[in-house]
């Protein structure tokens, strides 16, 4: 605002004269090091006073070349790369990649391994939504829910550590099953968590849904109509908050999801409030799925017995030279899927996560393309922010729940 404009119109001028007060359009650089961007995201924001006229996202600060790297590693070696894209819901990438390679190979995953995958995937979804809830409300100035959300998340990470040995980047899912069976203490501890988690989720919803302050900050802010959401390619909670009933677990079931009973929560207005509410209600559905999975967790193998896919058991290495040779070739050369191409979509915490893999018959994929939901969902940010206020832009970013490792890859 220029000083000469202020001199022309006195401070005690009547409203009709004050309307003539002019402002300058300003460009504001937000990020890439800024807590509200949830990672290394840079936004070029054009403002007229406090009103957002335009937002241009600049990405690529976390680009690590995952797709090209995976084309120069064996199918088995790539398992260590996949969880590092979406580090908050890493089981989703592990599972999607494994399903795509298994489709190429025609592998058969044992029922117990499928059930274990579902349990861990839904637990990982819960942990991701807890981060979304805690940090999203923290961006709006609510500090207490952050500690509540991370309290339950720590319990989930402890469960992961028991099963996989890692709190992050688990590398537990294998082509044709999982690395090993669940430890004995896992199921009893998981049941303890499932006893208290539904009540805690009710508390989370009450904390923000019944808060008049949050209601004013979130209701009607960053509205994305259903037709716009579809045109922009939104998926996951951001799409369902606009009232579009699309969940990959229902539309294209995998890992036996068609045999589980769960609902798909939908929003009504497609605003920040609905995007928060839908994800909290999704947490209840994840609890339902895990409880059903525990009931059908029967004893059995956890790897495809096909020797072309699964290495020989460790105890055979002490008595069989053939087992030693095959074990060596399995981990150095890997297996050779037939020529072909596949695309397998899955439902991650952020939306449709898909792996497109092309095989030329070698031990390494010829082409890997990852359909990352965070990358696609971020395209809606300019539309959702236009006409809103600067503080509301922070809430809109949080409600889209982007993970920059998923965006840049």
Curated annotation (Swiss-Prot):
Gene: nqo4
Family from the record: Belongs to the complex I 49 kDa subunit family.
Protein name, entry field: NADH-quinone oxidoreductase subunit 4
GO molecular function, one term: quinone binding
NCBIfam families attached to this UniProt entry: NuoD, PRK06075.1
The UniProt record lists the keyword Ribonucleoprotein: no
A matching Pfam family: Complex1_49kDa
Domain of life per record: Bacteria
EC top class named in words: translocase
Assembly and interaction partners: NDH-1 is composed of 15 different subunits, Nqo1 to Nqo15. The complex has a L-shaped structure, with the hydrophobic arm (subunits Nqo7, Nqo8 and Nqo10 to Nqo14) embedded in the membrane and the hydrophilic peripheral arm (subunits Nqo1 to Nqo6, Nqo9 and Nqo15) protruding into the bacterial cytoplasm. The hydrophilic domain contains all the redox centers. This subunit interacts extensively with Nqo6.
SUPFAM superfamilies assigned to the protein according to its UniProt record, in alphabetical order: HydB/Nqo4-like (SSF56762)
Catalytic activity field: a quinone + NADH + 5 H(+)(in) = a quinol + NAD(+) + 4 H(+)(out)
Organism of this sequence: Thermus thermophilus (strain ATCC 27634 / DSM 579 / HB8)
Function: NDH-1 shuttles electrons from NADH, via FMN and iron-sulfur (Fe-S) centers, to quinones in the respiratory chain. The immediate electron acceptor for the enzyme in this species is menaquinone. Couples the redox reaction to proton translocation (for every two electrons transferred, four hydrogen ions are translocated across the cytoplasmic membrane), and thus conserves the redox energy in a proton gradient required for the synthesis of ATP. The Nqo4 subunit may contain the quinone-binding site.
Alphabetized InterPro entries for the sequence: NADH_Q_OxRdtase_suD, NADH_UbQ_OxRdtase_49kDa_CS, NDH1_su_D/H, NiFe-Hase_large
């Amino acid at each position: 605002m220029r000083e000469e404009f202020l001199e022309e119109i006195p401070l005690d001028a009547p409203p009709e004269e004050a309307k003539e007060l002019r402002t300058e359009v300003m460009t504001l650089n937000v990020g890439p090091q800024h807590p509200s961007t949830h990672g290394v995201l840079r936004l070029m924001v054009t403002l007229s006073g406090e009103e957002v006229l335009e937002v241009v996202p600049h990405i690529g600060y976390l680009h690590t070349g995952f797709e090209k790297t995976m084309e120069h590693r064996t199918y088995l070696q790539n398992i260590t790369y996949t969880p590092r894209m979406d580090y908050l819901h890493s089981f989703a990438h592990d599972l999607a990649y494994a399903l795509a390679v298994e489709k190429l190979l025609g592998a058969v995953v044992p029922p117990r391994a499928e059930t274990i995958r579902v349990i861990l995937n839904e637990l990982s979804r819960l942990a991701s939504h807890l981060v979304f809830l805690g940090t999203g409300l923290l961006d709006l100035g609510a500090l207490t829910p952050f500690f509540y959300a991370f309290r339950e998340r720590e319990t989930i990470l402890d469960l992961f550590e028991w099963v996989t040995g890692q709190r992050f980047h688990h590398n537990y899912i294998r082509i044709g099953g999982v690395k090993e069976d669940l430890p004995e203490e896992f199921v009893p501890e998981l049941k303890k968590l499932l006893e208290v988690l539904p009540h805690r989720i009710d508390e989370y919803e009450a904390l923000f849904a019944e808060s008049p302050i949050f209601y004013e900050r979130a209701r009607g802010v960053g509205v994305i109509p259903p037709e716009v959401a579809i045109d922009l390619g939104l998926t996951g909670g951001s799409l369902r908050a606009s009232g579009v009933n699309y969940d990959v677990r229902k539309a294209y079931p995998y890992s036996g999801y068609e045999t589980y009973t769960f609902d798909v929560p939908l929003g009504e207005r497609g605003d920040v409030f609905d995007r928060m509410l839908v994800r909290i209600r999704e947490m209840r559905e994840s609890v339902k799925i895990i409880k059903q999975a525990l009931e059908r967790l029967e004893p059995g193998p956890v790897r495809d017995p096909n020797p072309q896919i699964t290495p020989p058991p460790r105890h055979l290495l002490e008595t069989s030279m053939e087992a030693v040779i095959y074990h060596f070739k399995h981990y150095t050369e890997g297996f050779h899927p037939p020529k072909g191409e596949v695309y397998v979509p899955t439902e991650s915490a952020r939306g449709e996560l898909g792996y497109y893999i092309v095989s030329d018959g070698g031990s390494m994929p010829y082409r890997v393309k990852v359909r990352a939901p965070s990358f696609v969902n971020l395209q809606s940010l300019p539309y959702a922010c236009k006409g809103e206020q600067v503080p509301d832009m922070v809430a809109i970013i949080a409600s889209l729940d982007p993970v920059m490792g998923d965006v840049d890859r």
